[in-house]
UniProtKB/Swiss-Prot annotation:
The keyword Cytoplasm does not apply. Late DNA-binding protein which binds to the hairpin form of the viral telomeric sequence. Required for the production of mature virions (MV). This is Telomere-binding protein I1 homolog. Keywords: DNA-binding, Late protein, Virion. One of its GO terms (molecular function) is DNA binding.
Amino acid sequence: MEQFDQLVLNSISAKALKSYLTTKIAEAIDELAAKKNSPKKKAQTKKPENRIPLDLINKNFVSKFGLKGYKDGVLNSLICSLVENNYFENGKLKRGKHDELVLLDIEKEILARIDENSSLNIDVLDVKVLANRLRTNADRFEFKGHTYYLEQNKTEDIINQLIKNSAISMDMKNTIKDTFYMISDELLDVFKNRLFKCPQVKDNIISRARLYEYFIKATKPDDSKIYVILKDDNIAKILNIETIVIDHFIYTKHSLLVSSISNQIDKYSKKFNDQFYSSISEYIKDNEKINLSKVIEYLTISTVKIENTVE
């Protein structure tokens, strides 16, 4: 019993005791009400993490960290952990040459020009980008004795080959406005393990349109960015973010841009506040249900992505 409680109970005053008990009861009721009304977190079932096949990971990276023994593939979380623990110090990319990491020429140039305290430094928020660059998309997969080659702009050929080899079959019951296929768990496992993710299916049924979209994404090169080019320096002033000019282009960090914009979006209305929108409406014409990816597109200049192959 607390000292204050003891003093109250030692008091002869019935009035004081009544007041004390009333207060305690009220506090207990408030506490129960708060617990009852607090949102309960739904138990989330964690999906098993995919393993990246060794032949799809940078060979120098595999060799340096002795990953050749991982015959069933390497967890992506392990790759991220190795990158962060070996190439980063105090939350930032270590200075110097890193032969295993894939850094674009413009990224190397920016790092060479900025000081260690700059917010433009590559930091732990970029670990996932660097880890993803250490793997490449599969150019083929095998299923029941047949090899299927994944090439951009040849998605129709892949689907037709799967049908020809009876790897997938038409679902006549659901095929009305769109063609639907039945796809086995076995083939879905091949997709998950070789192409890093599964297409969206329901009861092993998938539409041709959705399967087509899946293969388009599976053959698309990684386009994750660390730095982006702003359309003009006024954007940087509005968002109050650091930039660097190289060859007349204004560069900033993608993560800085995303963070700054996100801070201006109301989480309930999904809109910018009026004052901020007024300052940036020259670039963003619509303030209804802001799409962050689209906003980034409006504020930046598209660049040609030079594909980095995994060796």
